């Protein structure tokens, strides 16, 4: 069955909340069930299989994490992976696949200390990268495609008003369901790491309280964006850059090697270790003595000396 062959191919790159259950190695019928009918529908209509991926928002404002506000080699490798994935699917199914990146940076810039100007610059950089790698299977979708004639603040308020759930209902799920609790913790720690650096005059306790509240707001808007995107692309398969439960209706996906389950190009810097690119925090990369590479007047990635690279490869093999 072509649809199952395609799905199992995609599942090779699944990003899961846990990799200890049998489903991590051999997806069961419940793992496949949310996605197979959608793939089969595209096949029956001889159409490209369409995926949506909320991702590529903007770079973290934390200089200890990233190289700056513009896309770098991390984004380039991730976008090339997505294009390659579509190319691989076309070898299984003649009509191939398409991916729409639903850029959510504008959705919560005010919550994560990113300016709208930097969101715009980042998005322009992403489009340049797509052109450079000839990514003909990828297009983009953003808040401006939906709400026209509004300021960015008005767009965000309209999104929340029309699509958001009450914060209280999100808190209830976080308190009662482990998968929601893990997601909350992931968002909280991303915010906390940034706020510690960005607001050095605030106490740790103040930042903990603020990030706790902000994390719920980020999840609220993220869910609202998910609902909006789902209404615009009701038949599409949903990819996610966040780790997912085995039986989720979203497919968490690894686009580039990371040092943890939550790593993304916009919260890390890319480093070439002599074998492959991987994502790590910028400060950690610099602490181990990697050298910075520039491209087109922008910082691109780091490279390790052979000696340090071999040491890291040895450590990776032991872990």
Swiss-Prot record:
Q: What is this protein called?
A: L-tryptophan isonitrile synthase AmbI1
* Gene3D superfamilies per the UniProt record, alphabetical: 3.30.60.140
Q: Which reaction does it catalyse?
A: D-ribulose 5-phosphate + L-tryptophan = (2S)-3-(1H-indol-3-yl)-2-isocyanopropanoate + hydroxyacetone + formaldehyde + phosphate + H2O + H(+)
The function of this protein is:
Involved in the biosynthesis of ambiguines, a family of hapalindole-type alkaloids. Responsible for the synthesis of the isonitrile group on tryptophan using ribulose 5-phosphate as the source of the carbon atom.
**Family annotation (Pfam families):** DIT1_PvcA (PF05141)
What are the alphabetically sorted keywords of the record?
Answer: Lyase
Q: Does the keyword Transcription regulation apply?
A: no
Family under the similarity heading: Belongs to the isocyanide synthase family.
InterPro entries for this protein: Isocyanide_synthase_DIT1, PvcA
The EC number(s) given in the record are 4.1.99.25
Domain of life where this protein originates: Bacteria
Provide a Gene Ontology MF annotation, just one.
lyase activity
Q: Which organism is it from?
A: Fischerella ambigua (strain UTEX 1903)
């Amino acid at each position: 069955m072509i649809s199952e062959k395609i799905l199992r191919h995609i599942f090779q790159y699944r990003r899961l909340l846990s990799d200890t259950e049998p489903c991590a190695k051999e997806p069961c019928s419940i793992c496949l069930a949310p996605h197979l009918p959608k793939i089969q529908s595209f096949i029956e209509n001889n159409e490209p299989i369409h995926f949506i991926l909320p991702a590529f928002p903007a770079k973290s404002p934390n200089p200890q994490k990233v190289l700056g506000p513009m896309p770098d080699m991390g984004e380039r490798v991730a976008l090339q992976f997505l294009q390659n994935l579509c190319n691989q699917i076309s070898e299984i199914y003649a009509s191939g696949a398409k991916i729409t990146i639903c850029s959510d940076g504008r959705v919560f810039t005010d919550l994560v200390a990113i300016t709208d100007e930097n969101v715009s610059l980042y998005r322009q950089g992403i489009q340049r990268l797509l052109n450079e790698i000839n990514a003909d299977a990828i297009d983009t979708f953003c808040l401006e495609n939906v709400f026209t004639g509004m300021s960015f603040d008005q767009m965000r308020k309209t999104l929340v008003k029309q699509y958001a759930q009450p914060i209280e209902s999100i808190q209830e799920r976080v308190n009662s369901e482990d998968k929601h609790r893990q997601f909350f913790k992931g968002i909280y720690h991303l915010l906390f790491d940034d706020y510690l650096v960005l607001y050095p005059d605030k106490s740790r306790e103040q930042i903990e309280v603020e990030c706790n509240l902000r994390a719920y707001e980020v999840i609220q808007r993220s869910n609202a964006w998910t609902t909006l995107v789902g209404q615009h692309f009701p038949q599409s398969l949903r990819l996610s850059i966040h780790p997912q439960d085995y039986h989720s209706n979203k497919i968490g996906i690894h686009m580039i090697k990371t040092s943890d389950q939550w790593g993304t190009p916009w919260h890390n810097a890319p480093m070439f270790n002599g074998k492959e690119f991987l994502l790590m925090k910028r400060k950690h990369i610099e602490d181990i003595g990697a050298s910075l590479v520039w491209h087109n007047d922008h910082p691109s990635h780091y490279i390790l000396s052979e000696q340090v690279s071999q040491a890291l490869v040895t450590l990776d093999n032991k872990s």
